[in-house]
Amino acid sequence: MPAFTQYLVIANVGIFLLQLAGGGGLVQWFALWPGDGSGLASLPLLTPWQLVTYSFLHGSLMHLAFNMFALWMFGTELERVWGARRVATAYFLSVVTGALMHLLVAGAFGGGRAPVVGASAGVFGLLLAYALVFPNRKIMLLFPPIPMPARVFVLLYVLLELYLGVTGTQSGVAHFAHLGGLIGGWWVYRFGRSGPRYRRG
């Protein structure tokens, strides 16, 4: 596994273990708190570090496992082509754009006082970048197990997230944070500079 992807997975797993060990304060201080920040009244409305730190926290083992699997799957391939710096830029920019999108939607439509945790926005940014770099690479769905080109997979996933976000069918998931993460991945694909050059085989 390339270095950045490996270190990022290790960091996420390590912080989740701290959460399990009783680090309830981690969520209070480092999750993304929209709305009036009612989870911790002494905090300001929004502290800047939350725009990044929320991505290192996870709500459950399944939440962590799914995100780390996707991070390994897409981040590994991208890092081999782009290099660590560009992948890191895409990931963390996606984390920030995902947070900003969630705050914008929560502020405009309300109902967004629950804290947001998880690496999903960063993963979505890498997923879009992966589909742009490898549009015809086949991705196998977990359920149902149907292979499809990466570009089709991303399009279907985006439409599903948009539907779930607008209708509120699946509560407890920050769908607009996921969608906002796409912006960071696209931006780095469009305007970022690659790391090591490579030849197509």
Give, region by region, the residue ranges found by the protein language model:
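A detector for small-residue-rich transmembrane helices and their helix-helix packing motifs
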Residues: 1-201
